[in-house]
Amino acid sequence: MQKAHRMLVGACAAVATLAFAGTAFASYAPKLVVSSTGGTALGGATRIGVVVGAADDATANTTIYVPNGYAVGTPTPGTDLGKVTATAAAADLGGAVLPLTGELDAIAPNATTQAAAQSCGITPTQTWDLHLSAAGQTLDIPLFVVAPLAPETALGFTQKLVVCLPPPDVPVGTPGRSVFGAKLLSATFTSSAITQPTAAGDYRWTSLFT
């Protein structure tokens, strides 16, 4: 059990290095952290977190690759999958860092999420929603479950989690601009639909930030 936990930490370090190498000419070094909600227990829900530096460029797209061994269920739309906490720097509020809280829900696709998926260039098999609130505003960010491509499957990944974020660094009034001109700094969510392996082993998570 401890071996599996150590490899998760190692995978996060490798992901951070990969993300940095891919953006060597920009200020951008995001980090991915994956943990268990049950400590070293096997088979429980999964907690996923991302962190981006306050001085880093804004994130547009995040793809998280789920390794073989983890099971991704198909919850019924309307199911509460877990809690979400996040922080974002709001340009319209002088750069104030806003704490956001909410929940991760399984939802049925709708016109808004379908447009978001098309903009991301993906065909999701499931649609989840990061339902957040801060400063009297509600923010819904689609999180898509996407089947991996054949080369990704060959590398040992069973699913992809994809989030495409609205731009914060465009003029006020631009269609699709993020609320408050908010730039994501961190987000952590728990999903009961992503269960950990039932056997100890080496499980490497990988991510791509752009």
Language-model features, listed with the residues they occupy:
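Cleavable N-terminal signal peptides
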Residues: A13-A14, A24
